Amino acid sequence: ISSVAERTEDSPDVKPYTQETNTEWISVELPPEMKAIQTLLKLSLDERYDTLRKNGIRLAEQQSLSALLRIRQFVLNQNRRSAKPLFTAIRIHYALNILEAHGITSFLKFCERAKIKKGAGVKELFDVDPNFTRAIHLAKDAQSKGIEHSKILKLKEIVESVPGKALIFTSYRDSVDVIFNKLTEMGISAGILIGKSGETGLKQKKQIETVQNFREGLFRVLVATRVGEEGLDISEVNQVIFYDNVPSSIRYIQRRGRTGRKDIGKLVVLIAKNTIDETYYWIGKRKMTAAKSMGDKMTKVLQKNQEIESQKTGLDAFL
């Protein structure tokens, strides 16, 4: 590589073709019912961490899901007695993340699927563990009362604050249905755009039809999973809403790029306080900063190498 070309939104040859995108970060508090469930799940998780530490596994005080996933192979190969608490901890961590970012219904649907799968610790977790079983009981009680994530209550206010079309992104399939149903109940016309996998997935023909209907204004809001981030030709939207955060700078840019093409756009990012949302926010922020500085660093290295090459004389110049 002899040179690197870097472009940002402010580059002279790019700026004429883009519009400003105003970004708003909105923090919400989990409802008390969800906080109670969150506490129980963390207690259940801590029990597994204690067992893993007693078995000689080194864990940080605040253990991430990705860190747990990384030690799976080590446990299977060299510390088999830790397999059950580790895989149970991973299941609990997934459940906790889904609760925090997506809400009651998505959490319960995840638990329903996890319970019927065979695996180490499944029966103990769902039938014996007092904290986890209590968490599920509280979640079902909250669901029966119509309690969902606080983000849902914010959506109507956000969507109606900007006239025109809105695109809502969520990483989790189950929350697409929750968001769609709640918007419909609120009297907001909406459509769904999801991937092709699974029994409930949309085939490509249906995806294209959904996008076309959105473009023609048959509904005002499109709720999409990752399939809406790239590839499909979704028309210009006035507002993009991140229902959840993604720790990927590439996916952040792809989501954000759906607005602010022809006119000034708006991006709204919903963050639940003291949850995985905040963690992903900071991870994403660091990655964005790193990505912006990468081009400059590479250019400086290449310039330095070129200077060294130009200074070579004599025999060195031919080696």
Where are the language model's segments positioned?
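A short beta-strand element within the Helicase C-terminal
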Residues: 223, 230-245, 265-271
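Helicase-associated low-complexity regulatory tails and linkers flanking the ATPase motor
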Residues: 289-319
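Switch/connector loops and helix/strand junctions flanking conserved nucleotide-binding motifs
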Residues: 12-17, 36-38, 200-201, 231-234, ...
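Helicase motor interdomain insertion/brace
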Residues: 3-15, 33-181, 185
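Short beta-alpha junctions and helix-cap segments that line functional grooves
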Residues: 210, 251-256
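Conserved segment of the helicase C-terminal RecA-like domain
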Residues: 256-287
